[in-house]
């Protein structure tokens, strides 16, 4: 039987793709993309011309049977995100879970993840916990933060629209008992890191906040 490949792709710099990922994308019959327009940038760069179809959080349930029919008819299918590893704050969990129930072969082709790269840069200690995206609502977000344990480094992806308020929430909940490291646009031209107190980081960000951010914070023992 054919199989489903879960393929990691670059998070910014197209040169970060692995040889194995390229080999896989070149040999499969179909590629499921979070956004076909975004994926075409990578695929065109490496002259990969395969049938594409969208697979994202708004259609992942409805596309499951289509993917399974392709595989059961003998076609290999690769799943890729706009950037990084599928499943990590991106679609893929449901596909993998349901494929296992059907005993469909799965193979993961590893790639870059922003959270692991950011953690390495942070110099914060193990253990760490990846939170994905915190709640969009300030009240619920603060409740999430209050449940976290001290002595652990936490990693979160943060929208530029929620960044300042999230930093303020950290300060309100933890006061001086939190260390913060913020990085933006990892592997891209304007990659930049922000360190210091929360107030200092907010000042460094200024009024024009652009790009994709990864936030790491370490809760110190009170």
Swiss-Prot record:
Q: What reaction is this protein's catalytic activity?
A: cytidine(1402) in 16S rRNA + S-adenosyl-L-methionine = 2'-O-methylcytidine(1402) in 16S rRNA + S-adenosyl-L-homocysteine + H(+)
This protein's GO cellular component annotations are: cytoplasm
Top-level lineage group = Bacteria
Q: What is its main location?
A: cytoplasm
Task: State a single Gene Ontology molecular function.
Answer: rRNA (cytosine-2'-O-)-methyltransferase activity
Instruction: Give the matching InterPro entries.
Output: 4pyrrol_Mease, 4pyrrol_Methylase_sf, 4pyrrole_Mease_sub1, 4pyrrole_Mease_sub2, rRNA_ssu_MeTfrase_I, SAM_MeTrfase_RsmI_CS
Q: Where found in the cell?
A: Cytoplasm
State the EC number(s).
2.1.1.198
A Pfam family hit: TP_methylase
For the protein in the UniProt heading, the enzyme class is: transferase
UniProt keywords (A-Z) are:
Cytoplasm, Methyltransferase, rRNA processing, S-adenosyl-L-methionine, Transferase
Q: Which HAMAP family match?
A: 16SrRNA_methyltr_I (MF_01877)
Q: Which family does it belong to?
A: Belongs to the methyltransferase superfamily. RsmI family.
What is the annotated role of this protein in its UniProt record? Catalyzes the 2'-O-methylation of the ribose of cytidine 1402 (C1402) in 16S rRNA.
Q: What is the protein name given in its UniProt record?
A: Ribosomal RNA small subunit methyltransferase I
Q: Which organism is it from?
A: Mycoplasmopsis pulmonis (strain UAB CTIP)
The beginning of the lineage is: Bacteria, Bacillati, Mycoplasmatota, Mycoplasmoidales, Metamycoplasmataceae
Q: Which gene encodes it?
A: rsmI
């Amino acid at each position: 039987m054919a199989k489903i490949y879960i393929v990691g792709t670059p998070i910014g710099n197209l040169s970060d793709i692995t040889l194995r990922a390229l080999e896989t994308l070149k040999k499969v019959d179909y590629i499921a993309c979070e956004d076909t327009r975004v994926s075409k940038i990578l695929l065109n760069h490496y002259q990969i011309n395969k049938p594409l179809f969208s697979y994202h959080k708004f259609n992942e349930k409805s596309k499951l049977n289509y993917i399974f029919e392709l595989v059961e008819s003998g076609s290999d299918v690769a799943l890729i995100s706009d950037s990084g590893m599928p499943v990590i704050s991106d679609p893929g969990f449901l596909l993998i879970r349901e494929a296992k129930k059907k005993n469909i072969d799965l193979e993961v082709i590893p790639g870059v993840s922003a959270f692991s790269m950011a953690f390495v840069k942070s110099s914060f200690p193990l253990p760490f916990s990846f939170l994905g995206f915190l709640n969009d609502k300030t009240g619920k977000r603060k409740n999430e933060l209050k449940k976290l344990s001290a002595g652990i480094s936490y990693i979160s992806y943060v929208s530029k629209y929620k960044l300042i308020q999230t930093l303020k929430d950290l300060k309100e909940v933890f006061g001086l008992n939190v260390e913060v490291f913020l990085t933006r646009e990892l592997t891209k031209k304007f990659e930049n890191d922000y360190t210091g107190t929360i107030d200092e980081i907010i000042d460094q960000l200024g009024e024009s906040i652009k790009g994709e951010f990864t936030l790491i914070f370490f809760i110190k023992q009170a």
